[in-house]
Structures are given as structure tokens and as C-alpha cells.
Amino acid sequence: MAAAPLSYEIRLARDAQEIRASQRLRYAVFVEELGGAGPLIDHENRLEADEFDPLYDHLVLIDATKPEEDLDRVVAAYRLLRSDRAAEIGRFYCDAEYDLTPLRASGRRLLELGRSCVHPDHRGGAAMLMLWNALADYVLAHEIEILFGVASFHGTDVAALQQPLAWLHHHHLAPEGLRPRARQFQRMDLVAKEALDRRAALDAMPNLIKAYLRLGGFVGEGAFVDRPFNTTDVMLLMDTQAMSEKHREFYTRRVEGRG
């Protein structure tokens, strides 16, 4: 896996304990910080879990200064599912929110990304870049051609999100042949293109979404309002074969240390 600073280790989770540690981080971010809910959330043990966890690879960034039994040692995480594995399971997580027929029909190697999170104490540094580095290794190892997954705006007040949603629709809509559509369709073109406020749109855009856009990413058609999780979701896609050399260099840029 990718290199990381000396106090960190980054790898795929090796056992149930490391998956539980990623679930502890997800609880801190998605439940305590963002107010999400779900049927399998364990409030007593502070774990955010669902039925998909045993089926996915879990990419985890570990604070190596903490003991192995400490569930707070995972400080950043991603959840990954390849299309060959999804074919065995019968579905992706995103199937509940978006019609993925165009992606499946493409015949290309897919990777679903989800549950991306970074502990508040580790934001603004190298943690997200470390995840991207390790993700790049995974993509190359499995010859992935398209990455996709839902990314979230905090809250379900679509009117308050009309500028960033409309900006995504007008400037970053995926090619029609690769464009998933939201099942419970929420229009994103809530502001006419000529009435967009670029600064307001980008200021309201989550950093993860902006990172995908910098790498040449696209969005699907329509948003999905996830009331139990207290988010408004958009579908992000990235075609690794269509990435420019500039984007590819950013995506695979290394950070010094060990992994």
C-alpha cells in the first residue's frame, strides 16, 4: 500500500477488530458530528455499521502510536467494493439510491467507494492524500476503470443547497452513457446556469466533492435526499482512463514514510 508518515500505517483492514475500529470512526463522524441514524447503529458501543460491512474491503489509516486494542486508532477510512465482488453479492450499496444500469452496461471494471471519513483531529493535513495514494494502488492492482460512489452534503434542506447542486448539474454532469439517475429523484438544476454564483456554490461544496472535481470527476443525474442519515447525496464518478496527466499525477502523488 501507499507510504505514510511514521506515526501512521495505511492498509486494508486485516481483521474484525480493525473493521470495528473503522466503524467507531464512522460513528464519530456520521452519527455524533453529522446527526445520522440507521437500523444497525450501536449507540452503546459507538459503532456505525450496516449489512454491507462484511462484504467490502475497508481501507484504513491507523494511528500507530495507539495500542491494537484501541478502537480509536483508525483515523481515516474508505469502504471499497469491486464490480466482480458485487456480481457475487448481487448489488452495490448505491443501488438503493441510484439506477446504476449505465455503469453495469458499460462492461468496464467498476469500484464503488463509500463511507469516506477522516477524524476531525486529522483533517487539513495529509490524511486524505494518504487515502488517495493507497486507493491509487488498489485501483492499479485491480485494473479499475471507473470509480463511483455517493458523496454527501450535510442536511436535507435542498433549497439551502441550490447553488452547489445547480453548479454540479450545469458544469459536471457525467456523459449520458455513464450517467446514473437518482431513484427518488430530486432535481439539481434549481438555479439557471446564468444565475449561478460560483463563489457561493464552491464555498458550500464539501471538500471530498471538490477533490473529485479537481481530478476530473462527474456527477450523476439528480440528488437523493437521505433523511435518516441527514444528508443530501450526489453520485460521483471518475473515469480513470479519461483522467488527464495532471490529474493522474495528483492522484498518485506519494507522501514520505511507511505503509
UniProtKB/Swiss-Prot annotation:
UniProt pathway: Lipid metabolism
UniProt similarity note: Belongs to the acetyltransferase family. OlsB subfamily.
Reactions performed catalytically: a (3R)-hydroxyacyl-[ACP] + L-ornithine = a lyso-ornithine lipid + holo-[ACP] + H(+)
Molecular-function GO terms, alphabetical: ornithine-acyl [acyl carrier protein] N-acyltransferase activity
Coiled-coil segments: none
GO BP annotation list: lipid metabolic process
Function of the protein: Catalyzes the first step in the biosynthesis of ornithine lipids, which are phosphorus-free membrane lipids. Catalyzes the 3-hydroxyacyl-acyl carrier protein-dependent acylation of ornithine to form lyso-ornithine lipid (LOL).
Entry keyword set: Acyltransferase, Lipid biosynthesis, Lipid metabolism, Transferase
Enzyme type, top EC level: transferase
Enzyme Commission code(s) on record: 2.3.2.30
Protein name: L-ornithine N(alpha)-acyltransferase
InterPro entries: Acyl_CoA_acyltransferase, Ornithine_N-alpha-AT
Deleted gene: phenotype: Mutant lacking this gene is unable to produce ornithine lipids.
